[in-house]
Amino acid sequence: MDPLSISMESKVVLLGSSDVGKTALSLRYVDGIFPKRLTSTIGASFLTRTINIEGNKIKYLIWDSAGQDRFRSLATLYYRGACVAILVFDITQQKTFDIVKGWVEELKANIQEEIIMVLCGNKIDLEQNRQVKSETAKLYADEINAMYVETSAKENEGVEGMFLEIGKKLILNKHNEYFKQFQQQQKLHKQFQQQNQSLYQYHIQQQKHQQQQQQQQQQIFKNQQFYNNGHLQGSINGHNNQNSTNYSDNSDQCCG
């Protein structure tokens, strides 16, 4: 196994109006089916799928949230902690595209951590009824720093590719995170080395200072010894000279 390979779980939440095809996209991707009849999701549904991308393992935890307004207040429970938000609109209904913009503002207001946003124009099998131009959607995706994809859950177009691109982005982000952690560790290691070097230099300076103090003390001691010995010798010499003088004086007196 490649030591640089990644194994991760990623929470993915699908947001958007009711009947834009969120549940159909989830079922197409996870189970490979397109149900002929679907009822509106109540609250949220939960599906999982694990994929491998170039030796990296990703387990998608897919939350399909309800699009009805009466469940809007519960949405924060579903997108909290999500790594990816897929904002789905129906290309044949301009209103669903406008509603997506409200979801974007809500995400920005309630999510502090970085999240991958994907703007998904679904139902391209109904191209003849398109109301939202691809160019318009792409410009908005660039504005919010999101990926833009177009899909058809019915015809199984773009669905696999969307989750593949999401996976590649997740892997890239994880590698970047590891690289930042490595850089931080290197920075801390460098600071630690610098601190150790400073402590070592301080220790050397202290040793030199102690040696200088010892040398000074030794020199002072030598000077004191020299002074004491010189003073003692001078006293002895002075005493001898005095005795000699007295003796000479006495000799002169005796001879006289």
From Swiss-Prot:
Its main location: membrane. The keyword Membrane applies. Residues 230-256 have a biased composition (Polar residues). GTP binds at residues 16-23, 64-68, 122-125. Gene3D superfamilies: P-loop containing nucleotide triphosphate hydrolases (3.40.50.300). It is found in: Cell membrane. Keywords: Cell membrane, GTP-binding, Lipoprotein, Membrane, Nucleotide-binding, Prenylation. Residues 229-256 are annotated as: Disordered. Disulfide bonds: none annotated. A lipid is attached at residues 254-255 (S-geranylgeranyl cysteine). One of its GO terms (molecular function) is GTP binding. It comes from the Eukaryota. A motif (Effector region) lies at residues 38-46. It is a lipid-anchor. One of its GO terms (biological process) is endocytosis. Belongs to the small GTPase superfamily. Rab family. This is Ras-related protein RabJ. It comes from Dictyostelium discoideum.
